[in-house]
Amino acid sequence: MANVLVLKSSINGETSLTNQLINEFLAARQAAGHGDRLTEHDLSAMALPTLDRPLFAALRGAVDPQPAIREVVALSDQLIAELKASDLLVIGAPMYNLNVPTDLKKWFDLVARARETFRYTESWPQGLVEGVRAVVVSSRGGIHQGETTDAVTPYLRAVLGLMGIQEVEFIYAEGLDNRPHGRDAGIASARAQIARLAVPALVVEKLCLRWRPFYFRVI
């Protein structure tokens, strides 16, 4: 059984294709016998604060007398605790103007904290989030995978890697606005990727036993 942290960031709520594909991925894992324990956030409904100078300083350890700032630091601590307690992080990241949604960026601004999720060394930052892998679901109107127009993929790989999450899989639903058949093809491709990633729990367990000590968790 795995602890799964789910982050939905679409502004379109339940009509969002990204959110629907996340639900399908979680249902596929359940059908495969994983029995996940879910913690789910709709980031677009959380009204997360925008990073500004006082908040940035407080997140780096400065003492701020403002109650509102202290509340946000406490929220940051809570979100970080959720992340560190998870085995699998599922991120919904639809492409908006070539990048991630604003609310998802706000979440990262609260959890990517020096001395909490990464630390500086003499050569390179070291991630402090251990034993977590990530799956990103990203829908796009056009086809951007592997192109310079895709800022979503490199940003998420970089910020997750900064915190120590190196194993990141992407489920892309692309070309959704291409007519006449782009949407159907994009959804079919995403569902094929979901089927590939939703490996039956028994198969994962056998791999873990076979390749010990390289596999530490059944996720």
Regions found by a protein language model. Give the residues of each.
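Gly/Ser/Thr-rich active-site loops/lids in small-molecule metabolic enzymes
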Residues: 111-117, 159
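Glycine-rich phosphate/pyrophosphate-binding loop and the adjoining helix
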Residues: 146-211, 215-219
